[in-house]
């Protein structure tokens, strides 16, 4: 049962449940970019992301990846395990795009083989800075063993999700993951969605992700709806769902 509101991030609100080991992730319709500097509301966006995330988390679980996801409980919300989150973001890049293009001087769209893995400190006030294992060790964020395990799982996740999208003629350009501990074991947490991945049409290279909003490249709702359609997800957005998003936050 959904209880008190615990906290809100950029696009989700977290609620307690009757079980102290479980939480509810409520996907809101807020769109943010550039560390919250650009903001907008896209009605129904949270519903698309909740459905896509549930689908991908199920795929990962089927392949033996331990995730926080338990079940989708309605159009906007999912029940998950409560993790002790690690304050790092693990990024996997299959194709050059975003910050790596400027930072390393790569050409946008260049394939990266093997994939490049990057670490970022999860800190909104600092803009989630790019770091390496030496920072992790010195600042005692977590152990080097946990980082190595998370990076290994990240590549496994990459193989599974890339295959899912390749089958629908979409390139998985890059994505970020977050991890947490549960009873001493490492679990994949947070979400996997067009808000946390770059997804390009294989032929046209048209994006179907949050870059549509970041760089004013098109309609976000259309892009997310297209991903749902390609994945075979039947997503219905009605007035009650939209009202619920505002009532719960």
Give residue ranges: language-model regions.
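C-terminal helix-cap and adjacent tail motif
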Residues: 110, 192-249
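A short glycine-rich, hydrophobically flanked beta-strand micro-motif that places a catalytic Asp/Glu
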Residues: 71-75, 166-180
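Short beta-strand elements
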Residues: 27-28, 94, 187-194
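Active-site loop/lid in soluble adenylation, ligation, and acyl-transfer enzymes
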Residues: 1-120, 231, 241, 246
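Conserved metal-phosphate-binding beta-hairpin within the catalytic cores
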Residues: 92, 172-190
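Phosphate-binding core of ATP-grasp and ATP-grasp-like enzymes
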Residues: 110-127, 158-171, 193-198
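Residues forming anionic-ligand binding surfaces in small-molecule and nucleic-acid pockets
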Residues: 27-36, 116-144
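A long amphipathic alpha-helix within ATP-dependent nucleotide-binding catalytic cores
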Residues: 141-173
